Amino acid sequence: SYHNRSLALYASLGFEVREPISTMQGKPIQETIPGRSVRTATESDIESCNAICKAVHGHDRNGELRDSIKQGSAKVVLHGYKITGYTCGLTYFNHSVGLTNDDLKALISSATGDYYGGPGILIPTRNTQLFRWCLNNGLRLVQQLILMTIGLYNEPAGSYMPSILY
């Protein structure tokens, strides 16, 4: 929900408010996160990425992940030699998952170009450590959104960045 009337309408239809989301935009952060490295994701990473998504969300997003790997936008973050997170792309329209905030910071810091794709990247505002890190590294808040669901919802058990699409 991005508008007060939408929020009220969806709430009256039975949707549950789950999370305030901050759209962040600006020059991509170029910071090295100790102990983390990032590389382009490959087909051989799918099983590890799906396991991380299941650990954080209770389900995987295999279809989006496979499509992103084919498009060349997916990346994985490694702590040592172990995959500890991934992104389908650092845009408004792609999700990211990590076991820790440092995993997401490394992924966010791997962006290239002049800005993050679309209106920006989506950061759960209640993840104050990650939200403040983005602000302290020059990103600006451009839009406030509300994540709402109807039906089954698993409270995330790790670090994540949602997609506007799913």
PLM region spans:
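Conserved active-site alpha-helix within GNAT-family acetyltransferase domains
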Residues: 1-20, 126-143
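Conserved N-terminal entry element of GNAT/NAT acetyltransferase domains
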Residues: 27-43
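Long, charge-dense
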Residues: 22-25
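Intrinsically disordered, low-complexity, positively biased terminal segments
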Residues: 39-166
